[in-house]
Amino acid sequence: MYKLNKQDAIAYDQRGGYINQAGKYVVTIESAVFHVGNNANGRSENLKLSVIDNQKRKATFFINTSYSNGVQNEGGLRTVSAILACLREHDSGEPTPAQVKEYNRETQQEEAVMRDCFTKFHGKQLGIVVQMAHEDGRENPSPNLYSVFEASSELTAGEIMRAETRPAQLGKIMAYIANKPLIDKRKNSPVPPQPTRQPMPQPATPAAPVEDIDSDIPF
């Protein structure tokens, strides 16, 4: 009645765990938490994005959008805009309380907690490109969110905004990741740290005035 399927048997051993290799993944967003940090320098704002792929491998990315001194993190804001484009959403909506799962280091298991979340993101599929990074304070490299793309089409945010229909940029990104799957950000690294992003080509046409931006969104 049942027969051995070699691929299924191999996949069984690969299920679960965490994303721990550089590459591209199609993931489902489990939670998008509005994470606020408070310290002596002030308040910082972050998007804590928890994702899972079809093999049940998980990853969590912190995207800082505002430093504790109140200065906006332009790189983080660009990343959030790219995610919105790849999800075909105009905005994240306001954070609202929602139940999410978080790992408790003391009990060493996941627990249900209430957090302020951007629930528009929850359950949506997203393409991500991961580059592994070795950072101070961590024994092993951890996944770094290098780029995002639309899960269904493999179009990048820029291609979506230009209303293009054929993905071209993702292949270039993956060629770069194949060449640099791991970067070492440690201060006492034995090798000089590598840049985490490729220089991006400048747009051929000037950016639209602020008041026209929303009307130019092609979705």
Segments predicted by a language model, with ranges:
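Short beta-rich binding modules
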Residues: 1-219
